[in-house]
Amino acid sequence: MVMYDIGNSRFLKQALLVLLLTAMGMKTYAQEDHRNVVRLFRLDGSFSTELPVKISSEGKSEGFGFTLRDARLEADSMGFLTRLRSVLTIANSDAKRRITEVEWRLDVYDEALHSLSQRVLQTDKVNIYAGETGVASAKIGAVLPDRMVVLLQLIRVAFADGSAWSPMEQCSLGEDLRTISCKSK
């Protein structure tokens, strides 16, 4: 009978470390792909804070031809109404096509009640040429919670040649308001 001490095996420790780093790298890559189309924010007052999220996904992310470089939300309270402005910075990495329109969805959750308050589609006509970066923005006015968590998801990106991109998965926010699950449409 051969006894093997796993705790003292340098080779086994290195192999497990490589396996662990490889698995973590794949998970990070999958989440980074979803960051191209999904962001999560917390609003308490005027400005938003982007929240770290856990993303679970059924499918594989595809190449987009663009990157959601940055996104931010700003809120102005006007009595019982709140004006919410979303600003997206899009980088066009497609070598040939010009982006002409960006559409996104905001799912606004009441942080205190952990429930969906509003779902809003926003769109902006833009001209983002190949290799350039541009801004898409839109405003809404609605009765919104004082403290909210907002899930932003790109819905459609249209190009000048008539083609359009839309995600293969639709994402939703979990009950903990931190976990995003993406499922095939």
Regions found by a protein language model. Name each.
Residues L16-G25:
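Hydrophobic helical h-region of N-terminal Sec-dependent signal peptides
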Residues I90-K96:
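Asparagine-centered strand-capping/turn motif at beta-strand->loop junctions
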Residues K96-A112:
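Short acidic, flexible loop segments centered on an aromatic residue
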Residues Y109, V149-K185:
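Surface-exposed edge beta-strand/loop patches
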Residues Q31-V87, T179-C182:
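Low-complexity, acidic Ser/Thr/Pro/Gly-rich terminal tails and inter-domain linkers that flank the onset
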Residues Q118-A164:
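Short, solvent-exposed, Trp/other aromatic-anchored flexible loops in extracytoplasmic proteins
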